[in-house]
Amino acid sequence: MANYFNTLNLRQQLAQLGKCRFMGRDEFADGASYLQGKKVVIVGCGAQGLNQGLNMRDSGLDISYALRKEAIAEKRASWRKATENGFKVGTYEELIPQADLVVNLTPDKQHSDVVRTVQPLMKDGAALGYSHGFNIVEVGEQIRKDITVVMVAPKCPGTEVREEYKRGFGVPTLIAVHPENDPKGEGMAIAKAWAAATGGHRAGVLESSFVAEVKSDLMGEQTILCGMLQAGSLLCFDKLVEEGTDPAYAEKLIQFGWETITEALKQGGITLMMDRLSNPAKLRAYALSEQLKEIMAPLFQKHMDDIISGEFSSGMMADWANDDKKLLTWREETGKTAFETAPQYEGKIGEQEYFDKGVLMIAMVKAGVELAFETMVDSGIIEESAYYESLHELPLIANTIARKRLYEMNVVISDTAEYGNYLFSYACVPLLKPFMAELQPGDLGKAIPEGAVDNAQLHDVNEAIRSHAIEQVGKKLRGYMTDMKRIAVAG
């Protein structure tokens, strides 16, 4: 099979990369009615599989789970989760032939095997759903022409999808129809009903494409969402300890610092995050972020180039075929780092202390968010898509580090995200070491003293922060998410 994106001509590539439309709430007036009375079979009962299924059932849909015979016979975790929540469970052969919509929510590396197994069992005219388009775009999976192929991609982990639904809300969601597989022209109706059934329409839905979702998702997770947080954690911890900070305190400042800092980001964008600093600290954080952007821009561009060309995907799939040798080696090495093995700090760190002593961390967040956003937009991805794949998801990933450091982040994210994270962080850490060596007192671990600032300089910096394109689009999109709960509880 050939990478689907690479089979398109340039005009088609640009059209699909640039497909992005914020949908009005009135477009979801019918809710999930298009799928009511139809059979929806979910393959996979992980975090997305279970929680989307719970929401869809609560929205009045007929949901069951198709699992492998071995998973049922051995009563594995997927079988237990589905049955304990009262769902009908059966084998592929028992459930797939009756399904009107088969939703594939297994991990990326299992998609080809799953799709090749279920396709012959699917009835004529059925629909196949994904929550990530890697299998279609990067693997180039060929789907029977009578089958409609759609995507509903919540921009949150599965647990958040469920919790926001239970609160009567939802999470921002991308939906798409594969242009090669919409024989009856009903793909958008199916995708809208599925999104409404998960609650996504209450938080904002973007009509996107499989291509735009995949390319932007890969870029975000590799760079700012995971790679930058991992590289920043390792670099900042080593710098603090090198300068005599208690390793336990240093570890806590970083582990919970990302979460606390990005909670401000979630509520009010880069503007609010920077406003939490004193004026002298804000000017310093801005200067550091500009230096970081200049240093890291080529690395961000390389990741985007490799994602667009398919180089990243082909390398990762080669590692799949080699039993994940690179992935598992990098995972083991990360677990042995000084940050991951540092003792726990039992003392209290106040919320403002994370900002005052984390000026460099704030600069890293600002630089990483803006670079990821700018690089995606420069590659043809529309601003709304770039926002969701950079700034929006960052607090959610930071929250995983607050739970169990980098180990938890890498367990929770997909193997695809984890592989890309290691590629980025392994390149970024040595790239930034000369920069780290030139830091000044107050950049990390100590507060910058209050003092006089130049009013004109402060005015210009504030204008530069607020006028960035990500702040403009973010203000609009956050207007649809005002009811989402706080994530951070600083340690």
UniProtKB/Swiss-Prot annotation:
GO cellular component entries: cytosol
Keywords from UniProt, A to Z, are:
Amino-acid biosynthesis, Branched-chain amino acid biosynthesis, Magnesium, Metal-binding, NADP, Oxidoreductase, Repeat
Keyword Disulfide bond on this protein? no
Which pathway is this protein engaged in?
Amino-acid biosynthesis; L-isoleucine biosynthesis; L-isoleucine from 2-oxobutanoate: step 2/4; Amino-acid biosynthesis; L-valine biosynthesis; L-valine from pyruvate: step 2/4
Q: Which reaction does it catalyse?
A: (2R)-2,3-dihydroxy-3-methylbutanoate + NADP(+) = (2S)-2-acetolactate + NADPH + H(+); (2R,3R)-2,3-dihydroxy-3-methylpentanoate + NADP(+) = (S)-2-ethyl-2-hydroxy-3-oxobutanoate + NADPH + H(+)
Query: Where along this sequence does the record place binding of substrate?
Result: S414
Query: Which HAMAP family is this protein grouped with?
Result: IlvC
* Protein name from the UniProt record: Ketol-acid reductoisomerase (NADP(+))
Q: Which organism is it from?
A: Shigella dysenteriae serotype 1 (strain Sd197)
* Gene from which this protein is expressed: ilvC
